[in-house]
Amino acid sequence: MYRKITCLISLLLAGNCLFAQTTERWSLKECIDYSLEHNIQLKQERISLEESEINVKSSRASLFPSLSFSTSQNGRYQPYFDDGGNSFITSDGSGGSRVSSSKEHFSYSGSYGINAGMTLYNGGKKINDIKQKKLLRNIAELSVKERENTLKEEIAKIFVQILYSQEAIEVNKATLATAQESLNQGQEKYKVGKIARSEVVQLESQVKNAEYNLVNSEAQYAQFKLQLKQLLELEGSDEILIEQPATTEQLALSTLATVDEAYTTALALRPEIASTRLTSESSELAVKIAKAGYSPTLSLNAGAGTSNNDNSNNSFGEQLKYNLNASVGVTLSIPLYDNRTTKSNIQKAKLQQSSNALQEISARKELYSTIENLWFDAHSAQKKFIAAKSNVESAQASYELVSEQFNVGLKNATELLTERTNLLVAQQELLQSKYTAILNAQLLKFYMSGDILF
């Protein structure tokens, strides 16, 4: 029996080890790479990019001549047909006569033609349309990069929140363990009459509070993991664990570039800035395209055709040969009055041009504001982190001293709980400042490099 129980325990432990080995831990890079491959919104942006590529090809093709072939085949039926023979004379009832035929007739004819046409001049509308389509293609490509950057930023924020929650859980576990230990000691003292029942109740309350904090931090951890899985397009039942960076303290205290340095670098790198610039260029072309409505249009057209019918004595091939004809011509269309359509289009295009210029200025200001806030938050968090480290050390030493004094009866439960609360607050402030510094410092680097890895 003992051997069976031992074997069963060994199997259970082996199963747990196998599960632990097969549960993959995701690094930040792996999360980002997976999201860039599977995110649905990003896939939609890539589809839009492919559509813009097709629009460029279609616009280029409009410069070439159009070519078409046409044919028509016609049949004609005549139930009473006079072919000059096979007729007879009948009276018309008035003393006269007429010739009637008893023969029906069916005739057939066909025509064939090839036509070509192309626009020779239309005020540069087609050329500018090609340029605009290329710009729109580039804007669509930048939209893909914008979405990629947004995903990277969102994943990094949640990743850091998970790291924070993991450490918060460990802090709350340690707090619960010390609170439980103090309660056990207090109960022993109460049994021998060293402390009052009210102090035991206080210690019990502290344990319950520590349990609540632990449950709350675990719930936050689960919520952040769920958000990460949703960003990665993972099923809700799939388990995900993240890889803890080796040097979080070093990341928190990494050197910060100045605001101006970061802004100058980001200005040349960020896709949203390039996108607004290209949008302004596209609006300039839109004005030129609208103005082309005032220009004349010159078109060239040419065609060749032939025909046949069954009434001819010539063969089918001879008919096609002798009926062959060709034509060529040019068409000039000069706009005189178009119900203000062109003028309205020009005015609308200019208004859109002004709006896009303002949008470009706004994007630059927004970028500067974002970088300024990231730098300020990172710098402030670094200073808080350095101060919080000293505060935790002091709070830890004070708590240990009061705990020893409580054990020998020199301090009461209220004083012990106060010191433990101070230590917990200091530890939480340390965690918060550390991960706030990590997030903002790394995001600042991300705006300067396009990569966010730690």
Enumerate the predicted regions with their spans.
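Bacterial Sec-dependent N-terminal signal peptides
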Residues: M1-L28, I452-F454
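Bacterial Sec-pathway N-terminal export signals of envelope proteins
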Residues: A20-S72, Q78, G236, I242-E281, ...
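Small/polar, glycine/serine/threonine/aspartate-rich low-complexity segments that form flexible
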Residues: T22-T23, S70-M118, P245-T255, K288, ...
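Periplasmic alpha-helical coiled-coil/stalk elements that build and connect Gram-negative outer-membrane
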Residues: E30, I54, T150-T265, D377, ...
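Sec/SRP-type N-terminal targeting helices
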Residues: K43-I47, R60-A61, F106, L120-E148, ...
